[in-house]
């Protein structure tokens, strides 16, 4: 393919698409660039593997440190496993792509996005999303695109398309909107408690920019003469399909309308019907018109049974306005909450139950040194002081499988719940702790990520973290049949599995802090998006009321096992003095007091210990070591050595002065040893600090009040 360039501008910021330059053997490839950030995106497909009954789409996002002119650390000096940011970006690309492929497609598809160059202004993630659409179109893969994504920021009252890192950091909103010609297909957002109307306006603003990028892609493929590829859906075996309807339709409808059934009971009854039909067909001769297709396609009955169940459940919601558990469309499942469910050795814990979904969240308070260092990736963010980790063990859904490290789904759910809480954390200056919350999903029937948001809030409040406001969350669903649309509040597992949307909304009573929307259909109108956001508000408030009935406000006392933090600000030029040669001084303080000490480059010293007295002692030691001495001040010091004309006294750690023999006592002193000995504690006043910083001390003229104050304040090392 010949090289071809196309540009589109947003507020003076260009996005360039370069075709035919790189990766000629990939099915489709594009270099998408904005500023000095450039991402190569490729799409390649392979024939379907036998027995696959799902879309085997793989999206990989790769970052290379050469993109920022850096060499990786470590012995190997090459990139290792993808950081969490790369995994989340891979999910960001996958989520708007997946619903645009035909649901019957089984070909292997691999999309790879590689950041080749990166500046300090333009994030590569939204470029990679748009680039993925272009690459898929160029690869000739059946696709209901084009699709594109933009980021929307909010500075003051002004929305910005594709803000820089600095604008994102300084703004009130970080919103990514992806869309197709049909409408919005994906939303990912973090916000500083913005009201619903502002969020809706931002999504609409972003989708208008998405439409411009879609138009640009259409013009591109027209200019290149590349047709949009369509492929006929494989024919459904009507003989088997009709047999299933005759045998199972009424029974399935009856089960779906038995609202008292538990999830397990409903699943067992549906499985029994499916197994009975399979046994009936298996007993037939191989040449029978019912059995022969199932021999060619072993999963045919299971797939058709799922499709029938899906249609009947959706029809029940559309026609009757009632769900499989008997709830109304806007009704939340029963909620119960508990705090302090674990011993106080754990700093804080919260148990959140919503229907059959149960999440146990545990909060841990750490020191500034426990912050997660993000310095190895390409992004400006240095470290995280709030971490949320989400675990989804197999027993939570009654299954068995190997327990492995967190997968992409767990990382994504953890990041969403983390993003929901960050806007309400207390400022670091007021509460310098590093916070980690782990959410253990103990039972899952939908909306576990929002359960983790609620559990995290309870655990942090139980731990005594002074949150600005508590956060709750709800997952919204959608059933769309033609022009008929039904929005569901607080979806459960079967509604997520068989529905068209999973829209998670988290926030406080003042506004939204996080959004995540994924679709299974090619797009959603802004009208429906707005309605879903608005319908989530009363649900969030209802859930929040239940949470606050359990614990109205954060506890005023920390767990006795949580570290006590004290901070002191020192002159940055004195950091070396506190650390000492080879860390000798700071190690000595930590060994003497049993504390942990963290020192920031700006001179902030944080002392942590479960023993408050020892923390205070360490603070006094550092204060005395770094405080400025003034003439006329009185100190309690220790005699370190004696010479013929006087004695040297350490008044503060590392700071010595000399008392001349004439200043040791009233009247004439014959020998220094007559008045003091090495190791004696003595009260001294600073007579003079000479031009070289040397201290001249005296024991004369010290008022009793000055002496008492010096003894009280002193800590002699």
UniProtKB/Swiss-Prot annotation:
The KH domain, residue ranges: 563-622
UniProt keywords, alphabetically: Cytoplasm, Magnesium, Metal-binding, Nucleotidyltransferase, RNA-binding, Transferase
CDD domains membership: KH-I_PNPase, RNase_PH_PNPase_1, RNase_PH_PNPase_2, S1_PNPase
Residues reported in the UniProt entry to bind Mg(2+): 496, 502
GO terms (BP aspect): mRNA catabolic process; RNA processing
Catalytic activity: RNA(n+1) + phosphate = RNA(n) + a ribonucleoside 5'-diphosphate
Highest taxon, organism lineage: Bacteria
Subcellular location: Cytoplasm
Cofactor: Mg(2+)
One Pfam short name: KH_1
Classification via InterPro entries: ExoRNase_PH_dom1, ExoRNase_PH_dom2, ExoRNase_PH_dom2_sf, KH_dom, KH_dom_type_1, KH_dom_type_1_sf, NA-bd_OB-fold, PNPase
Domain S1 motif: 632-700
Listed GO MF terms: 3'-5'-RNA exonuclease activity; magnesium ion binding; polyribonucleotide nucleotidyltransferase activity; RNA binding
EC number of this enzyme: 2.7.7.8
Function: Involved in mRNA degradation. Catalyzes the phosphorolysis of single-stranded polyribonucleotides processively in the 3'- to 5'-direction.
Annotated family: Belongs to the polyribonucleotide nucleotidyltransferase family.
Protein name, as recorded: Polyribonucleotide nucleotidyltransferase
Organism: Microcystis aeruginosa (strain NIES-843 / IAM M-2473)
